[in-house]
Regions:
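Single conserved hydrophobic/aromatic residue that forms the stacking wall/gate
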Residues: 181-190
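Thiamine diphosphate
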Residues: 1-182
Length: 190
């Protein structure tokens, strides 16, 4: 007998999903997978983690960062911050209970540990959702979410109010990259 849990998330926004990358099924089940590779190893870089409808904002921000600021990024689709947290807790537990063995790495560390740049995670939920994985990364970690109450006439204005739109993601990304002491090319201000 296998315990299986199915959940379905519904949103009130219709949009086309990007094509599923090759060999990402395991990552989907574990909580995240890379949807966009970085294009250069020489430019300043950031890891963008997006979930739900905000993933599209992350993809758009990634394009702006590259075209206007020469900041490269890798974009990760987070299917479950909860699964990433559960895995992190289990790996942490195993490492603490077996100090004489080689430490294992959480799935989030396996994905992001060798990647360059800070991490920026954004979600349509409260920041605490993305913050669940903060302690399982060794990199600078920043999160964006929809904390508080927002009253806006359009979805675009609401995302801007909560600072989870592509413009705010770009601004936060540039600051996060500068805080990690990576050299940014000289460009116009945000």
């Amino acid at each position: 007998h296998e315990n299986i849990f199915y959940y379905i998330t519904t949103m009130n926004e219709n949009y086309s999903h990007p094509e599923m990358p090759k060999d990402c099924e395991d990552g989907i089940l574990k909580g995240m997978y890379k949807i966009k590779e970085s294009s250069s190893s020489k430019e300043a870089k950031i890891q963008l983690l997006g979930s739900g409808t905000i993933l599209r904002e992350m993809m758009a921000a990634s394009d702006i960062l590259k075209k206007e600021y020469q900041v490269d990024s890798e974009v990760w689709s987070v299917t479950s911050f909860n699964e990433l947290r559960k895995n992190g807790i289990e790996v942490e537990r195993q490492n603490l209970l077996n100090p004489s063995e080689t430490n294992k790495k959480s799935y989030i560390e396996e994905c992001l540990g060798k990647q360059q740049g800070p991490i920026l995670a954004a979600t349509d939920y409260m920041r605490i959702n993305a913050d669940q994985i903060r302690s399982f990364t060794k990199k600078s970690f920043y999160s964006l979410g929809t904390d508080g109450y927002g009253r806006s006439d359009t979805r675009k204005n609401l995302r801007s109010f909560f600072e989870v739109d592509k413009e705010h993601i770009v601004a936060y990304s540039l600051s996060a990259v500068s805080y990690t002491h990576l050299t940014l090319p000289t460009t116009s201000a945000v």
